[in-house]
Regions:
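Feature marks short, surface-exposed loop/turn motifs that line or immediately flank catalytic pockets
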Residues: 14, 66-69, 153-155
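Hydrophobic, Gly/Ser/Ala-rich alpha-helical and linker tracts in large acyl-processing enzymes
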Residues: 69-82, 89-92, 98
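Short aromatic-enriched loop/helix-cap "lid" or pocket-rim segments at secondary-structure transitions
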Residues: 18-20, 69-74, 114-115, 161
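Active-site loop of short-chain dehydrogenase/reductase
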Residues: 1-5, 54-56, 99, 141-145
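Residue(s) in the substrate-gating loop at a strand-loop-helix junction
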Residues: 10
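Catalytic helix-loop patch of NAD(P)-dependent Rossmann-fold dehydrogenases
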Residues: 4, 13-59, 64, 73-84
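Structural signature of the Rossmann-like NAD(P)-dependent dehydrogenase/reductase core
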Residues: 5-7, 58-61, 117, 148-150
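C-terminal substrate-binding subdomain of Rossmann-fold SDR/epimerase-dehydratase oxidoreductases
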Residues: 86-177
């Protein structure tokens, strides 16, 4: 019998947010991608299953996971086709890519590049442990709950590039397109 379940969801369930920062009170809107849609459907199935089969679940709505554990057992691998900024950065630093394309410099941000909330994979693992403890200790307020998992602070693409360069001592070849 299943008593407790943790679902790895995504902030993409919010669609195009009305305001920032995005809180758990923000409405779930039409997803902008098949990935976001799959997370919305997953949450709906789990919520209905919790009611029908009397078990508890928490959906953790990840923002943008980055980084690696010092053991290198979890985290970014600069292989394959990247799906977000950090693998593009690491592939450029490793020489797999000649140049990093930065898409746009006309966003309403301090440097004109898009801003995202990033969460380190170790902090994400800690969120899973906290969610599991909440369920095991029966501290949940309802049988299906959801929590945003991010830093709560946004970083622009250029800020991420500059932070990577500083931390790694590597200069990245990038171009605004």
């Amino acid at each position: 019998k299943l008593d407790n379940f943790i679902f790895s969801s995504s902030c993409t369930v919010y669609g195009q947010a009305d305001e920032l920062p995005i809180t758990e009170n923000a409405p779930v809107k039409k997803a902008e991608s098949p990935y976001g849609n799959s997370k919305q459907i997953g949450e709906e199935i789990i919520a209905e299953s919790c009611k029908a089969h009397n078990f508890n679940a928490i959906a953790l709505r990840y923002f943008n996971p980055i980084g690696a554990h010092k053991s290198i057992k979890i985290g970014e691998l600069p292989l394959g086709v990247p799906q977000n900024l950090i693998p593009f950065v690491t592939q450029t630093a490793a020489g797999i890519r000649k140049e990093l394309s930065v898409f746009g410099d006309d966003y309403p941000t301090k440097d004109g590049t898009v801003v995202r909330d990033y969460i380190h994979v170790v902090d994400l693992a800690k969120a899973h442990i906290a969610a599991l403890k909440r369920l095991i200790n029966k501290n949940n307020k309802q049988n299906f709950e959801f929590f945003n998992v991010g830093s709560g602070t946004g970083s622009s693409v250029l800020e991420v590039i500059k932070a990577f360069e500083k931390a790694s001592g590597t200069s990245l070849n990038y171009k605004i397109v």
